Design a protein with these regions (language model features):
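Rossmann-like AdoMet/SAM-dependent catalytic core
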Residues: 163-210
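Conserved class I S-adenosyl-L-methionine
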Residues: 29-40
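Conserved SAM-binding loop of SAM-dependent methyltransferases across substrates and taxa
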Residues: 40-52
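S-adenosyl-L-methionine
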Residues: 71-107
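A conserved beta-strand element that flanks and buttresses the S-adenosyl-L-methionine
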Residues: 113-114
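Conserved Class I S-adenosyl-L-methionine-dependent methyltransferase catalytic core
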Residues: 1-28
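A short, conserved alpha-helix within the catalytic core of class I
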Residues: 121-134
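Conserved beta-strand signature within the Rossmann-like core of class I S-adenosyl-L-methionine
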Residues: 138-151
Length: 210
């Protein structure tokens, strides 16, 4: 209501994601969540609402990051919202915003990383840079990833979920087709439509770099 956004499929998908994390990782209240590519801040706001002591870090393309900021600040105007552009800036205990173009230059520390439906839009070098960040944490770290198994980018490259830089040392907690990411509702019979290709989701305890 505070965000002036109607409840839609994306909202339902985010609720199911948070429910899964809460079920599989029952220790979330004071954790830091880093969301790679939220879009409208809806997942971050949902996490903050359910886990008030949590810290939220958004990483998004510069222009899209403005939407994360706009809607998160609308829902939580009384909390701190910091734009982080260098390692010289302190992180807020509430909401933090990092431009994707700068993420490799900033020492981002998080307990749980989340990526929904945006790694499928990246080339492998960018995906590799995010995995490098995730694997170079200094304490126990988890990563939830839900993306299309295979997608052809405009330049002709095909990005495959199973070719992301996973490790055999990652501990699999959830791994399979995502039940809520195979089809979406429409307002005419049969009242759903298949998404463009199957979507896999995976929750891991990350094998960190030694």
């Amino acid at each position: 209501k505070k965000s002036s956004r109607l409840f839609d499929y994306d909202c339902a998908r985010n609720i199911l994601t948070v429910n899964l994390l809460n079920e599989k990782l029952p220790f979330l209240d004071e954790k830091t969540f880093c969301i790679i590519g939220d879009g409208y801040g809806s997942l971050g706001c949902l996490l903050k609402k359910n886990f008030p002591k949590s810290k939220i870090i958004y990483i998004n393309l510069g222009r899209t990051l403005l939407f994360d900021l706009h809607y998160s600040k609308k829902v939580f105007p009384e909390l701190d919202h910091y734009l982080i552009r260098s390692n010289n800036q302190p992180f807020s205990k509430d909401f933090n915003y990092v431009e994707a173009e700068l993420h490799k230059n900033i020492n981002i520390k998080s307990d749980i990383f989340i990526n929904n439906h945006s790694m499928q839009e990246m080339d492998y070098e960018v995906i590799k840079s995010y995995f490098f960040m995730i694997r170079n944490q200094t304490k126990d770290t988890w990563f939830y990833c839900c993306n299309r198994i295979s997608k052809k980018l405009p330049d002709g490259k095909v990005i495959n979920f199973f070719k992301y830089p996973w490790s055999k040392e990652d501990h699999l907690i959830v791994n399979g087709l995502c039940p809520w990411a195979q089809r979406f509702p429409i307002n005419m019979p049969p009242f759903y439509r298949d998404l463009d290709g199957p979507h896999q989701h995976r929750l891991i305890k990350v094998a960190l770099e030694k």
